[in-house]
Amino acid sequence: MEQDLARIEQFLDALWLERNLAENTLSAYRRDLSMVVAWLHHRGKTLATAQADDLQTLLAERVEGGYKATSSARLLSAMRRFFQHLYREKYREDDPSAQLASPKLPQRLPKDLSEAQVERLLQAPLIDEPLELRDKAMLEVLYATGLRVSELVGLTMSDISLRQGVVRVIGKGNKERLVPLGEEAVYWLETYLEHGRPWLLNGVSIDVLFPSQRAQQMTRQTFWHRIKHYAVLAGIDSEKLSPHVLRHAFATHLLNHGADLRVVQMLLGHSDLSTTQIYTHVATERLRQLHQQHHPRA
């Protein structure tokens, strides 16, 4: 089994070198593929002897076990890449994953907040407290830029230019983009940098823009808990929440106000336009609801 686990690490090293994938993606691949190896060894199989039927059985067992289709799709993607790698490296003479059927995924629309709900969320932090002033600045930046939460918590002081009103973001695949901040976000960043950040650092010298209460880099999970806290204060239904709720609102509201789809794609850092197009469905659905509510013949 150790040999098969070592093959996984070799594969991940190759992915990192060739594709420059994010650490979160590599960690997810490691978890999924380690589970595959353990499952195979429990049945007396190895990476060298596994057949398509084995892998299809594994996927079927996960469906029967209640795993979501998205989880199975992610696992299938990991297995396909891995076994393609083993085939290219001539560890195997075939690729058993090539015969696997893909699970059908429902097209899920991003969870959407109205502009009024976003405004309530942005007003929830108490700005006279340094910790909540930090959160206020983070929420404003998130809504102004549409950053991923991982991108937001990873920002450093050198990533922002208040004079130019832009933020430099290193996104997926280490792709760099510049995103405008807007007046509100710049104002709250300036206020936070003057009155909030020095208190949080308490003499500690780090380059992180939004440090935790312990003067360390904040985790995505911590910020997600903060968002949920403010959503409760703002009276927002928890079913409308996700860690990327303000990123989704940013995209949908831009499209509602007439922004070009390709501009939104660039701001979000999507490599594929089809990923951005799902927000047009959210915007269209919002228009349909408004039409039904307010048109006299709807």
Which residue stretches match the model-derived regions?
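Conserved catalytic core of the tyrosine transesterase superfamily
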Residues: 1-298
